Swiss-Prot record:
Site-annotated residues for Important for sodium channel affinity: P13
Record-stated family: Belongs to the sea anemone sodium channel inhibitory toxin family. Type I subfamily.
Key word Disulfide bond present: yes
Stated consequence of mutating H34A: Minor decrease in affinity
Keyword Repeat: no
Subcellular location: Secreted; Nematocyst
Protein name as catalogued: Delta-actitoxin-Axm1b
């Protein structure tokens, strides 16, 4: 997946570690991950639990 910003990473993408990944739905996030931000019907922002 493509790196994305999780809520726990901080307010801005720049200067922060991007610990999330963009994941295509509707298959859901990988095991051990959860959708931390809604990003349309076909893409989820998945972050580690």
């Amino acid at each position: 997946g493509v790196p994305c910003l999780c809520d726990s990473d901080g307010p801005r993408p720049r200067g922060n570690t991007l610990s999330g990944i963009l994941w295509f739905y509707p298959s859901g996030c990988p095991s051990g991950w959860h959708n931390c931000k809604a990003h349309g019907p076909n893409i989820g922002w998945c972050c580690k639990k």
